[in-house]
């Protein structure tokens, strides 16, 4: 019997708020579990135990049925998020089911684990965590993942994204970009107030940070080919979950 998939949330249709497919209409499947514990994580409930009672162990067919029940025929794209969904070898059955139904799959991971099913992902964002996260990137593992994708002719489906909270993070991002210059590269403003319910104050704060980051990138000759993004869903809905 296939091993179940630990699911915390299924929601949508909405839009993707981050990375290479920002603005893309999508459904979301959020899995539980992560091998990191980033200091500023905006989805810590996926790994800190606070939502343990909410985890549902589901088969690929059950997840797909719930997606269709919620989204009907109003979607052709599914984003798998976490936590770190790359920890789940058993996701292969679900991704294959999406492919069988002509539904594109997107996934974001920090780049610590490679899975063979990465080659089935249409939009794969690898987001190594910067110093502000208090995590340390293993570049050997990241090298292995990106080399494996290239060997499987999947370089067109992958991008790199680094979340920026401070100048040290920006320097880290430049190091990543220099190491992998041929991979599309995105910088994104980090949300440093993931608990506030004052949406207007949060939006003004994040837009100010976004402008400051754009100003820095604009004059940096090492960042001529990067794209600088806001966290779009936060500007629309604040810290609300399930949107």
UniProtKB/Swiss-Prot annotation:
Which cofactor(s) does the record list? [4Fe-4S] cluster; S-adenosyl-L-methionine; Mg(2+)
Q: How is the cofactor bound?
A: Binds 1 [4Fe-4S] cluster. The cluster is coordinated with 3 cysteines and an exchangeable S-adenosyl-L-methionine.
Which residues belong to the signal peptide in this entry? none
Keywords per UniProt: 4Fe-4S, Iron, Iron-sulfur, Lyase, Magnesium, Metal-binding, Queuosine biosynthesis, S-adenosyl-L-methionine
Q: Which domain of life is it from?
A: Bacteria
- Annotated residues that bind substrate are located at 15-17, 30, 81
Quick check: keyword Hydrolase in the entry? Answer: no
Q: Where does S-adenosyl-L-methionine bind?
A: 83, 127-129
Q: Does the keyword Hydrolase apply?
A: no
Q: Report quaternary structure and partners.
A: Homodimer.
**What protein family is recorded?**
Belongs to the radical SAM superfamily. 7-carboxy-7-deazaguanine synthase family.
Which HAMAP family does UniProt cross-reference here? QueE
What NCBIfam families does the entry give? Bsubt_queE
Q: Any idea what job this protein has?
A: Catalyzes the complex heterocyclic radical-mediated conversion of 6-carboxy-5,6,7,8-tetrahydropterin (CPH4) to 7-carboxy-7-deazaguanine (CDG), a step common to the biosynthetic pathways of all 7-deazapurine-containing compounds.
Indicate what this protein is called per its UniProt record: 7-carboxy-7-deazaguanine synthase
> What is the organism of origin for this protein?
Bacillus subtilis (strain 168)
């Amino acid at each position: 019997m296939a091993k179940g998939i630990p699911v915390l949330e299924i929601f949508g249709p909405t839009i993707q708020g981050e990375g290479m497919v920002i603005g893309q209409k999508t459904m979301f499947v959020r899995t539980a579990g992560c091998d990191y514990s980033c200091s500023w994580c905006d989805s810590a409930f996926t790994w800190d135990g606070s939502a343990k009672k909410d985890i549902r162990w589901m088969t690929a067919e059950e997840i797909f049925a719930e997606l269709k029940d919620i989204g009907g025929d109003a979607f052709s794209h599914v984003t798998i998020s976490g936590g770190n969904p790359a920890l789940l070898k058993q996701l292969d059955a679900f991704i294959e089911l999406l492919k069988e139904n002509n539904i594109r799959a997107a996934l974001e991971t920090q780049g610590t684990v490679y899975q063979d099913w990465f080659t089935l992902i249409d939009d794969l964002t690898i987001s190594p965590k910067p110093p502000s996260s208090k995590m340390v990137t293993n570049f050997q593992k990241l090298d292995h993942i990106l080399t494996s994708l290239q060997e499987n002719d999947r370089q067109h489906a992958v991008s790199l994204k680094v979340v920026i909270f401070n100048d040290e993070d920006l320097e880290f991002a430049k190091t990543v970009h220099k190491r992998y210059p041929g991979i599309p590269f995105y910088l994104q403003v980090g949300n440093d107030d993931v608990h506030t319910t004052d949406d207007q104050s949060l939006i003004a704060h994040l837009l100010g940070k976004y402008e400051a980051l754009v100003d820095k990138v604009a004059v940096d000759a090492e960042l001529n080919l990067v794209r600088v993004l806001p966290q779009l869903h936060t500007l629309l809905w604040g810290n609300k979950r399930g949107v």
